Structures are given as structure tokens and as C-alpha cells.
């Protein structure tokens, strides 16, 4: 992608979109009733475990199509685990009749939100498309693997969406903008803290993490570091959008589209700069991959800054997502990580078996001890309710 051939069952892969859409609709309906467990079960447990098990089993059936089939199997499994609680919660839609007029009204009302989501999705695909125009398929494959590793912290934000939505809508009705700013700041800090911790744990021993896929993937470590940093940079935009979709949906959409243009320009510009760097020819593609990831990080960071400032202006309140404890935790985890990765190459397993838990443990302890206040801990307990 986009310069690889289409073979076998690749042609039928677009049909999987129906399972993706149906799952999203079912989980959204469950989130409306504060059923977060079903989302976690379908997205964080069933889907990844199904694709992992199916990939290992179907490899013996078809080395070429096995991964595609395992991906489709994971989508089907997630759909089943979303439909079952949906039926238990809502039952069957007896007496329902389709209405084209009503559907068009709903679609028109939600078009800015859907387009903003599409722009966010596109930002995670635009980098692959740009890289594919300049680099070989092998480099694109290495970048894709790094992208999948970096997508782990990205998935954290979805678990907080059902928390912010009701709080924002309720306080918008009463015009309690100070409470909205407070909640956005708190949840924003939670997401940034969680994503930064995972980014440190995966990024510092990045060579060992990428080496799990094979020695040829180690060259994607720089791209992995930039991609992990990009997810942290995007956290502020994520929580700001939770309120902007209600208060300024069209401006939010325009910012999202504008950031796609910024990403494309910066990424291509950085790739052009690689040509001016004295690099051995066999490493040019890896430098280009790092350049594309850096372009994504820059565009997401700019988007976060613009969206948070827009929301702050609309609310008339500052949005505080950063706390000093975060810097202390990052510095301490980084020092520990650098000490761990200094072990001899023959002990690389130590970086993963001991280093990753140690980095997460120290980082998490500092955040919990000095970053979280009583209100944060109370809100986490309320989340369970």
C-alpha cells in the first residue's frame, strides 16, 4: 500500500466495512446507556485476541491470504460481542420502519462530526500514502508495523469518550462552562499521562520492541519514536474535540482538514530534506519513514494547540491538561529506561521482560502519587459506577 499488488482475497476486503460500521453503531448505542464494558470487551479483548490466534492458525491454510482472513475474523468476532449485549439491552426493534427523510436529516446534522472523524482517520493513513510514493514497499511495511505498535496508546482515548459526553452535554444546557473546562482538563491529563507512559515504555527500548518482528524491522525505531510522540501530541485535540463537536462543529472540521494539508506539506518537505543529508543509500528509506512520522507529529501538535485555544476561548476558561508531575515522571522514567537499555546486546530480553514493566511502574507510581489529586481518584471510582 499504495504501491503493492492486489492478490487473492484482497479484492473482497472492502466488504469488511459493514462489520466495522455495525460494530461502531452497536457500541455507540451501548455507550449511551453507560455500558463501557462491552466496548472494552469487543475492542480490547475479543478483536486483538481473535486476530492473533486466527493469524497463527490460518497461516498454514494460506500464507498470502491468512492475515486478511484473520483480520476479517476479528471484525466478525467483535461484531458478535457487540450485538449480543445490544440485544440484551435494547431487544428487537419491533415496528421499526426505515425513513429516508429522517435518515437524511440525521446524516446532515452529523456530517461535520463524521467528516472530522474521517479527517482524523485520514491523518493515520496519509503518512502511509505519502511514504509509499517515495519509499520501497519494504520500507512501507516496516513503517506499517511501527504504526501498529504506536496505535496502542491511540486506543486509550475511546474509553474516555462515554465519560466526557454526558458531562459536556449536561453542563452545556446549564451554561456551566467552568465545569466543562475542568472536566476536559482532567480527562485530558489522564489521556496524556497514559499515552506518555506507554510511549516511554515502548519507545525507549524501541529497538528491542521492533526487533520482535525481525531484525530487519529495527530500522523503524526512529519512526516508532515519532509515532508514539505524535499520539501524545494529539491527546489535547482529542479531549477538546469532545466539546467542540457540540459548540463549534464546523470550525472543528475546518481545523481537522487544515491539519491534513499541514501534514502533507510538512511530510513532503521533510522527505525532501532527507535528500540533502549524507546518508548511505540503503538507509534513505528509513530516514524518509522517520520524516513522515515527524510530519504527523508536528501536524497533530499544531492541531492540538489550535483546538485547545479555540475551546478555551469559547468557554472563557483556561484548559489545563499539563501538570508538573508529568514532567517529573517522564524524566524519571527516561533515566531508568536509558540505564536499562545500556545492557549488553546479548541481554536484550532484559529490556522487554524487566525494562518495560519497570518503566511503567515507576512512571505510574509518580503520576498516581503526585499527579493525581483527590478529585481524580474520586472520578475514577465514579467511572466504574
Could you tell me what each predicted segment is?
Residues 7-8, 68-69, 101-113, 131-150, ...:
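Interfacial/gating helices of multi-pass transporter permease domains
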Residues 20-43, 225-259, 263, 311-318:
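Membrane-interface junctions at transmembrane-helix termini in multi-pass inner-membrane proteins
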Residues 31-32, 146-188, 241-246:
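Helix-loop junctions and terminal segments of transmembrane helices
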Residues 60, 64-71, 82-124, 163, ...:
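Interhelical loop/hinge segments that connect adjacent transmembrane helices in multipass membrane
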Residues 318, 323, 338-385:
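Membrane-proximal transmembrane or re-entrant/amphipathic helices at the cytosolic face
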Amino acid at each position: 500500500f499504495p504501491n503493492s499488488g492486489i492478490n487473492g482475497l484482497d479484492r473482497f476486503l472492502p466488504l469488511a466495512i459493514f462489520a466495522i460500521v455495525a460494530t461502531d453503531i452497536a457500541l455507540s448505542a451501548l455507550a449511551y446507556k453507560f455500558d463501557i464494558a462491552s466496548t472494552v470487551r469487543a475492542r480490547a479483548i475479543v478483536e486483538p485476541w481473535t486476530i492473533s490466534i486466527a493469524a497463527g492458525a490460518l497461516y498454514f491454510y494460506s500464507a498470502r491470504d491468512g492475515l486478511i482472513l484473520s483480520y476479517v475474523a476479528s471484525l466478525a468476532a467483535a461484531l458478535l460481542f457487540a450485538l449480543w449485549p445490544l440485544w440484551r439491552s435494547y431487544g428487537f426493534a419491533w415496528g421499526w420502519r426505515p425513513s429516508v427523510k429522517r435518515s437524511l436529516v440525521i446524516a446532515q446534522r452529523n456530517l461535520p462530526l463524521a467528516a472530522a472523524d474521517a479527517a482524523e482517520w485520514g491523518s493515520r493513513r496519509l503518512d502511509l500514502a505519502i511514504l509509499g510514493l517515495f519509499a520501497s514497499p519494504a520500507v512501507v511495511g516496516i513503517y506499517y508495523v511501527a504504526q501498529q505498535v504506536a496505535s496502542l496508546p491511540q486506543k486509550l482515548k475511546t474509553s474516555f469518550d462515554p465519560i466526557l459526553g454526558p458531562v459536556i452535554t449536561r453542563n452545556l444546557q446549564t451554561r456551566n462552562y467552568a465545569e466543562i473546562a475542568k472536566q476536559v482538563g482532567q480527562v485530558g491529563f489522564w489521556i496524556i499521562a497514559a499515552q506518555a507512559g506507554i510511549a516511554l515504555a515502548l519507545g525507549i527500548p524501541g529497538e528491542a520492541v521492533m526487533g520482535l518482528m525481525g531484525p530487519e524491522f529495527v530500522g523503524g525505531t526512529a519512526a516508532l519514536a515519532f509515532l508514539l510522540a505524535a499520539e501524545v501530541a494529539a491527546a489535547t485535540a482529542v479531549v477538546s474535540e469532545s466539546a467542540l463537536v457540540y459548540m463549534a462543529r464546523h470550525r472543528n472540521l475546518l481545523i481537522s482538514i487544515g491539519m491534513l494539508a499541514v501534514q502533507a506539506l510538512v511530510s513532503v518537505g521533510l522527505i525532501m530534506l532527507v535528500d540533502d543529508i549524507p546518508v548511505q543509500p540503503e538507509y534513505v528509506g528509513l530516514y524518509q519513514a522517520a520524516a513522515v512520522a515527524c510530519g504527523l507529529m508536528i501536524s497533530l501538535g499544531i492541531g492540538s494547540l489550535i483546538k485547545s485555544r479555540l475551546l478555551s476561548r469559547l468557554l472563557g476558561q483556561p484548559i489545563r491538561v499539563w501538570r508538573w508531575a508529568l514532567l517529573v515522571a517522564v524524566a524519571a522514567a527516561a533515566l531508568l529506561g536509558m540505564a536499562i537499555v545500556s545492557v549488553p546486546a546479548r541481554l536484550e530480553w532484559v529490556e522487554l521482560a524487566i525494562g518495560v514493566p519497570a518503566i511503567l511502574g515507576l512512571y505510574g507510581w509518580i503520576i498516581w502519587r503526585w499527579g493525581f489529586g483527590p478529585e481524580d481518584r474520586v472520578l475514577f471510582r465514579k467511572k466504574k459506577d
